[in-house]
């Protein structure tokens, strides 16, 4: 029984390490996925990409996703957007 509990806890820790929070990446343009006030669209897109909750961050006009894989998130250091939409 202790082994089963240990395996479950270990799995949860590994899953937590491989996920992150951030702005969704539009892989075609390299930009953030933009939005205005549509939380439903951002939430759906976030869940499709493996996250558990997404919303439209109004001040940045971009979809913010919690729990998605890092490869699905926009990163400032690897930004390839250059203003193209």
Curated annotation (Swiss-Prot):
Keywords (A to Z) from UniProt: Disulfide bond, Ion channel impairing toxin, Neurotoxin, Secreted, Signal, Toxin, Voltage-gated sodium channel impairing toxin
Record-annotated LCN-type CS-alpha/beta domain positions: 20-82
Secretion signal span: 1-19
Cellular component GO terms, alphabetical: extracellular region
Family: Belongs to the long (4 C-C) scorpion toxin superfamily. Sodium channel inhibitor family.
GO process terms (BP): defense response
Tissue expression pattern: Expressed by the venom gland.
Cysteine pairings via disulfide bonds: 31-81, 35-56, 42-63, 46-65
Record's function text: Beta toxins bind voltage-independently at site-4 of sodium channels (Nav) and shift the voltage of activation toward more negative potentials thereby affecting sodium channel activation and promoting spontaneous and repetitive firing. It binds to distinct receptor sites of mammal and insect voltage-gated sodium channels. It displays antinociceptive effect in rat models, which is due to its specific modulation of sodium channels of sensory neurons.
Entry's free-text remark on domains: Has the structural arrangement of an alpha-helix connected to antiparallel beta-sheets by disulfide bonds (CS-alpha/beta).
Molecular function as annotated in GO: sodium channel inhibitor activity; toxin activity
Pfam families: Toxin_3 (PF00537)
Protein name: Beta-toxin BmKAS
Subcellular location: Secreted
